[in-house]
């Protein structure tokens, strides 16, 4: 702590990112990265930007990327916002759309741990709504005064999916609140809520290119919703950083959306590997929650989760252990290649 800090800084509880180990030999199954590389066409497009044009600023509106997203989802570019990773997009949403006096912001008690961090940063009152015994969202629990609602779908870190019909029920019950569906993992088994944005002006859907499109190192995220909501995010962005995406990010992300064949192929590989891993872990006595993500959430009835994680690490396999409350005995395990998954099973 320094005497030069603004007063609120000492009260912040920052987000703790997942470990990024330096040893290349480790089997890394802790941060939900895609085990398959980016689209070769996207890599080629990014390499094409390594020229004298790097002396020039990128397009502040990222029009090439917005057009690619709009065409992919059947919306207009005016309904698309892009930013430097979905975390930045979410930060702008919290800053620009959730500061109201109608009640607290609502989100699940087991959810993305960045949400309370944003609330602390922007001074937003919030309430964590308890998931049921199966770690599922109950729509009726969100029928109370609120400043907005946000939840991951599929949820993180559980992987559980809220069906699109239930998402629509939530929207209908909260027409005067912004409802944000955080779809970081939607491509591994869910149906996007983007199909609902033309019917609900209170819906905002966020996505990332870090998971299903294998571009975690590029830092690109997006939001799709009513143009009025997008305008609010643009106003926040242009009051903070008018150039959030560089030239390589814009073109690489755009081509990643355009290369549908590669996207479909790699998503299918992850989904197939997930089902094989779930079956193998279940046979070893683990309880595995239903997952629609590129990870699974599992516990063993007779083995301590922290102990399992430590033993795996000793054998060169890293998984994520959350120590808090009702999930303290669960491990979150990223779906790797078949070889990576087998290394996990061998280590167990």
UniProtKB/Swiss-Prot annotation:
Q: What is its EC number?
A: 2.6.1.9
Q: Which residues carry this modification: N6-(pyridoxal phosphate)lysine?
A: 211
Biological or metabolic pathway of the protein? Amino-acid biosynthesis; L-histidine biosynthesis; L-histidine from 5-phospho-alpha-D-ribose 1-diphosphate: step 7/9
Q: Which InterPro entries match?
A: Aminotrans_II_pyridoxalP_BS, Aminotransferase_I/II_large, HisP_aminotrans, HistidinolP_aminotransfase, PyrdxlP-dep_Trfase, PyrdxlP-dep_Trfase_major, PyrdxlP-dep_Trfase_small
Q: Per its record, what are the GO molecular function terms?
A: histidinol-phosphate transaminase activity; pyridoxal phosphate binding
Checking SUPFAM superfamilies in the record gives:
PLP-dependent transferases
Q: Which Gene3D superfamilies match?
A: Aspartate Aminotransferase, domain 1 (3.90.1150.10), Type I PLP-dependent aspartate aminotransferase-like (Major domain) (3.40.640.10)
CDD domains assigned: AAT_like
Keyword annotations from UniProtKB, A to Z: Amino-acid biosynthesis, Aminotransferase, Histidine biosynthesis, Pyridoxal phosphate, Transferase
PROSITE patterns to which the protein is assigned, alphabetical: AA_TRANSFER_CLASS_2
Source domain of life: Bacteria
Q: Name one GO biological process term.
A: L-histidine biosynthetic process
Q: Tell me its cofactors.
A: pyridoxal 5'-phosphate
Reaction equations catalysed: L-histidinol phosphate + 2-oxoglutarate = 3-(imidazol-4-yl)-2-oxopropyl phosphate + L-glutamate
PANTHER family assigned: HISTIDINOL-PHOSPHATE AMINOTRANSFERASE, HISTIDINOL-PHOSPHATE AMINOTRANSFERASE 2
Query: Which HAMAP family does the record associate with it?
Result: HisC_aminotrans_2 (MF_01023)
Q: What is said about its interaction partners and assembly?
A: Homodimer.
* Record-stated family: Belongs to the class-II pyridoxal-phosphate-dependent aminotransferase family. Histidinol-phosphate aminotransferase subfamily.
- This protein is called Histidinol-phosphate aminotransferase
């Amino acid at each position: 702590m320094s005497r030069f800090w603004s007063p609120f800084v000492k009260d912040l509880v920052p987000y703790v990112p997942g470990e990024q180990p330096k040893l290349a030999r480790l089997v890394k199954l802790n941060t939900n990265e895609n085990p398959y590389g980016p689209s070769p066409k996207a890599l080629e497009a990014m390499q094409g930007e390594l020229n004298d044009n790097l002396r020039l600023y990128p397009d502040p509106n990222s029009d090439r990327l917005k057009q690619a997203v709009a065409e992919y989802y059947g919306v207009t570019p005016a309904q698309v916002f892009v930013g430097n990773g979905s975390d930045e997009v979410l930060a702008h949403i919290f800053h620009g759309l959730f500061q109201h006096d109608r009640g607290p912001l609502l989100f699940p008690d087991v959810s993305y741990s960045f949400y309370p961090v944003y609330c602390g940063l922007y001074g937003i009152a919030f309430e964590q709504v308890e998931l049921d015994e199966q770690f599922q969202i109950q729509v009726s629990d969100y029928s109370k005064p609120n400043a907005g609602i946000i939840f991951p779908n599929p949820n993180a870190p559980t992987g559980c999916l809220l069906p699109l019909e239930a998402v629509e029920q939530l929207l209908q019950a909260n027409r005067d609140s912004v409802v944000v569906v955080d779809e970081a993992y939607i491509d591994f088994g869910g149906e996007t809520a983007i199909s609902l944005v033309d019917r609900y002006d209170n819906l905002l859907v966020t996505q990332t290119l870090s998971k299903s499109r294998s571009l975690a190192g590029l830092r690109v995220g997006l939001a799709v919703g009513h143009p009025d909501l997008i305008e609010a995010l643009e106003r926040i962005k242009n009051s903070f950083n008018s150039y959030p995406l560089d030239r390589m990010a814009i073109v690489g992300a755009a081509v990643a959306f355009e290369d549908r064949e590669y996207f479909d192929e790699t998503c299918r590989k992850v989904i197939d590997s997930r089902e094989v891993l779930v079956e193998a872990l279940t046979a070893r006595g683990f309880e595995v929650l239903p997952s629609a993500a590129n990870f699974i959430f599992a516990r063993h009835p007779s083995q301590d989760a922290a102990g399992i994680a430590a033993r795996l690490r000793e054998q060169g396999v890293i998984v994520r252990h959350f120590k808090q409350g009702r999930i303290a005995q669960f491990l979150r395990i990223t779906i790797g290649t078949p070889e990576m998954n087998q290394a996990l099973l061998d280590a167990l």
